[in-house]
Structures are given as C-alpha cells and as structure tokens.
Regions:
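PRPP-associated nucleotide enzymes
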Residues: 1-231
C-alpha cells in the first residue's frame, strides 16, 4: 500500500475532512450538503453539525454485472438518472436492455424503499440555484459521484463541490470535468477499495442510520417533523 492516511473510523475521517474544508466560504454561500450514501451518514452528520449546515440524502443504487456482484457496471439515482461504465458493459457483452431493466428494478425495489424509510416518502427538496457539496466516505470508481452530479445538474443547482476523505487519483481527474471543486484528505494512485483506508467502521445498520437522522438537528427532511413534535 502507498504511504496513505488510514482513518480510525468514520468519526476520524469526518474530523480530518472538516479540517480541510473552506468553512467560512461554505457557510457564507449557504451551501447545502448532499450525503451520497447511507454508509456516509455517520461522517456527514458529524461534519454538518460542526459546520452548522443542513444536509439532504440523494439515493442511488449500483447495478452489478450478471454473476459478478462485485463488478459495478452502472449506477442509477432516485431521479432515474443513469451513469454507465460502457467499457465494462462491452467487455462482458452485457445487453443494455439488461442494464436499463436492472436500473428500473433497483429504483422500484431499493431506492423507493429508502425514500420512504429515510425521507418519509418525500421527494428531494427544491435545489434550484443552490450551492451544494456532495459528500461520501470514499471514492473508488466515481460512478456514484458522477450520477449524483448529473442528477443535481438536472435539478438546477448553481454549483457543485465534492468532499471525500479518500479518492482514486484518476477518478478525481475525470470528475473535475463535471464538479467545480474537489476537497479530499488523500488522493491515491493505486486505489484498493474504500474500506481498506479505515481501521474499523462504526455500526451503520439501517436502524442506526435512521436513529442518527431522526436525532440530527441538521438532517433537513426531518427538521419539520422534529419541530412538530416539540410544539
């Protein structure tokens, strides 16, 4: 392994990423943070509490090659935006009908379920003319970041930044064509996988994540519910 930073856990990653963020600029621009995955909620919630900024979830699901669940060939977002890895699709001679069929199935079976569970069934809030920064706990292929960026562009955001503790160097370069600014603790030339850069991971079960979101003063979709409970 290269001489890279290894994070103790998501809380450690949150602290180190927070240190390099342009805090005043993000606050002055009233930036909305977009959490890209349920696994990243522990880190993102901590950063948002420290920044004093609100966050939203943007749900997406990976589409795997037939008979190879470890090989991601596409990613679909909650607006049914799709990003394809055409090179892999062609190399494995996978039909595009299969890919789009799987994308729709993932949307129906996984994404809609998550929207109901973690956002009470509501669509993502109005993002027009918002400055947003997408965050996740690590970036290996960039497909999820790319589908999130494309989704946000279609939603009419004003600017998109991306913050992640670790990212593959080549992916950071390719994402720079669609993302305004990338903030990262470490760019890694020979990227292994995200979990390799964490000593351990804090519990991120659905129940744990839901509890964090319900208790958080910064998770935008549930703020109205919290206020209603207090009244």
């Amino acid at each position: 392994m290269e001489n890279t930073i290894i994070f103790k856990d998501q809380a450690d990653a949150a602290n180190k990423l927070f240190e390099i963020l342009p805090k005043k600029d993000l606050v002055d621009r009233k930036t909305l943070v977009i959490c890209m995955s349920l696994e990243s909620v522990i880190m993102v919630d901590e950063i948002c509490k420290n920044l004093g900024l609100n966050y939203e979830m943007l749900f997406s699901e990976c589409i795997s090659a037939p008979n190879n669940p470890e090989c991601t060939i596409a990613v679909v977002s909650e607006t049914e935006e799709i990003v394809l890895n055409d090179a892999l699709i062609r190399a494995f001679e996978i039909s595009y009908d299969f890919v789009y069929g799987e994308a729709h199935r993932k949307y129906e079976e996984k994404i809609l379920k998550n929207i109901y569970k973690f956002r009470k069934g509501n669509l993502i809030g109005d993002l027009r003319n918002r400055n947003v920064i997408i965050m996740d706990e690590g970036c290996e292929s960039g497909l999820t970041a790319l589908v999130c960026a494309k989704t946000l562009i279609k939603e009419g955001v004003k600017s998109i930044a991306y913050a992640t503790p670790v990212i593959a160097s080549d992916v950071a370069l390719s994402l720079s064509s669609v993302i305004d600014t990338i903030y990262t603790v470490d760019k890694i030339l020979h990227f292994i996988d995200v979990d390799s850069y964490y000593e351990s991971k804090l519990d991120a079960t659905d129940e744990c994540i839901l509890q964090i979101l319900e208790d958080s003063p910064r998770y935008l979709p549930l703020q109205k519910q919290q206020k209603g409970d207090e009244e």
